[in-house]
Amino acid sequence: MAKPSAGSVGRRDFLKTAAAGTAAVVSAPGAVDAAPQQPPRNATAPVVSRDAETGRTPTIEAVTTDRPGSDFMVDVIKALGFEYLFSNPANTFRSLHESCINYGGNRAPEFITCCHEEIATGMAHGYAKIEGKPALVVVHGTVGTQHASMAVYDAFCDRVPVFLMLGNHLDAAERTGVVAWAHSAQDVAAPIRDYIKWDDTPASLQHFAESTVRAYKIAMTPPMMPVAIVADAGLQEHPLPEGARLRMPKYTPAAPPQGDSGAVAELARLLVAAENPVLVADRLARTPAGLARLVELADTLQAAVVDQKRRMNFPTRHPLDQSNRSAAAYADADLIVGLEVGDFFGVRSKPGAKRVSMTANDLFSRSNYQEFQRFPDVDLAIAADAEATLPSLVEAVKRLITDDRRRFFQDRGSKLAKTHQDALEAMRTAASYAWDASPVSTARMSAELWGQIKSEDWSLVSDVIFVSWWPLRLWAMDKHHHYIGDSGGYGVGYGLPAAVGAALANKKYGRLSVNIQNDGDLMFVPGALWTAAHHHIPLLTIMHNNRAYHQEVMEVQKMALQHGRGATRASIGTKLEDPPIDYAKLAQSMGVHGEGPISDPRDLGPAIRRAVEVVKRGEPALVDVLTQPR
C-alpha cells in the first residue's frame, strides 16, 4: 500500500484529530453550565451545514424540549385527516418535519420527499383531483414559496383545494446568519396572495389551530382553491407553555352553496320547453356524484351534452354526448346551459338562443390575475355550485314533464344518438390517417395504449391537449377517475408532478394510473420521476416525445409568415434536439423502468405491455415514444 505523501492527512491521523477536538468541546469548563435553561425562540440545533451558511464554526447547544409547539401542530394536521405531506426539506420547518416523522410516526401524514416545491405542489394538485380533498404542502420561506408559485397558480385556475404551509423566521432578532435573513419575510404569503383563496400568519398555537381548520374549510367550500398558513419557526420550536390548555377546533364541512329555488324553477321551465337544449359541463363534477347527476339530468331531458373535460363530467360513449361535434350542437341550440364553465363567452350560440350560467365562480373572484375570462352575456345567472344544485334541478324538471314532452324528448334522443355515433365513426376514420407513420402518430399511440389498458381499472392522470385530445375521442370513459382534466393555468411543468400525485391517490384503490407526458413539460420537473421510484408509486408514463416545444414552433411560424419572412428558421429556440434527450435513460437514472425511444408503431404495443406489468407490480415505468408533433 502506498504511503501518504508529505502534507496529506492519513485516515488514522484524521480520526485522532477529530476525536481530540470533540473531547475538548465536551470537557471545556462551563460548557454545560453555559447552556441556556430556557431555549430562545428559533434555537439553533448543532447541524454541520450551518457552517456553510454562516461561515462561522458551528456551536453545540445542550438544549432539549420535551414538547415543542410543532407537536401540537401535528395534532391539528392529523385531526384534519391529511394523508400525505409533500415537501422538500428545509430549516424553516425543521421542527415540524421532526415532529411529523417522530411524534406523528410518519403516518397520516406520510412525508413524501420532493426535489422541488413546484413538484410538491403539483403532486398535491393531482392528488386532490382523485381524492377530492387536499394534501399538505410544506415549503421553505421566501424561496420555497416562490418555487411553488407556478403550481399554486395552476391549482387556483383549476379550482382545486391545495393546503400550503409556509415556513418563516418572522422575528428578525432570532435569525441566524445571512441565509435566514434572505429566506425570511414580513409577509411570506404575499407572492401568492393574488391566486389563493385565503391565508393567515398565526401568532400563537391556538391561533394556528383555529386558522388551520378555518383555512381547510375555506379551501373545501366551492369554489375550491388553494389556501396558505404560515407556520413560523419560533412557533414550531418553542416548547408548549407549562399547563397550556389548547383547544382543538372541530372541523365541520360547509354545505356547498345551492341555487336559489326560484332560479332553479325558472331553469327547469326553460329546459322542458326548449327544442334543442345543450348542457355544457366544464368543472362540474367535483366528485363521482356530479357525473351521475349530469347523466340523470341529460337522460331525463334527452338533451345534448358537451363535456369540455376539465373534469370527467359525462361518459364519452353515452349516446347524448355531443362533445365530438360541439360547434354543430351549439349552432342548433335554442338554449345553452353552462355548468361551471370557465369560459362561457367562448361558447358560441345562434342569435336569439337563451343562455344560462350556473357556477360557484360568481361567488368569489380575484382581480389581478385574469383567469376569469371575458364577461359572458347570459339571460339567467345562478350563483351556486352546480353539482350540489343538480338534484333539485332534476326534480324540478321531472315535475314539469308531460306525456307529450316525454315523447318529444325520446324522438330527440334518438336523433342525438345517431349524430353521436356518426361523430365517433368520423373520429375513428381520422385516427387511421398516418397509422403506420414513423415517428408515431398521436392517434396511433393513443389507440395502442388503449388496447393495453382497457381491461384494467385505469385512470388517465394527464392532460391530452397536446396529443389532439385523441384519448377523449377514442377511449370509453364512464367513471369519474377515468380522467382528471388539465392544469388550469397551462403552466409548463404541471404534467409529471400532477400525474405522480394522482397515481399516489389511486394506489390504495388498485388503479392503473396512466400519464401521457409531454417532453418539454417533463424537463421542467424530472425529479418527480425519482419521487415516484423512491415512494413506489405505480405510474405508467408514455412519452409524447416530439423533440420540441411544438406549440411555440407553430407560434413562431405564424409570426414569421405574418411578418413576410418565411417559417424555415422557426426551429431555433423551440427544438429539443442536438442532442436529443433519452427519456428512457433519464427514467432509469431515477430508478424508474424505462424503454425506448420507440419510433416504429409496431413495437409500441409490446413495450407498453411490458411497462404495464411493471406498474402492476407496484412500481413506475416509462416508455419513450418518438411522435408526430400533434
Which role fits each region the language model picked out?
Residues 282-286, 433-434, 518-520:
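Conserved short loop/turn motifs at secondary-structure junctions
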Residues 173-183, 330, 390-391, 470-629:
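Thiamine diphosphate
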Residues 1-9:
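N-terminal secretory signal peptides
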Residues 7, 16, 20-401, 510-512, ...:
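N-terminal alpha/beta PP-like core and its mobile active-site loop of ThDP/TPP-dependent enzymes
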Residues 13:
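Acidic/charged coordination and interface sites in well-structured regions
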Residues 70-73, 78, 96-101, 417-505:
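Active-site diphosphate/adenylate-binding microenvironment
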Residues 40-64, 206, 230-231, 243, ...:
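Phosphate/pyrophosphate-binding active-site segments
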Residues 85, 279, 305, 449, ...:
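Conserved hydrophobic/aromatic pocket- or pore-lining residues that grip, position, or stack substrates
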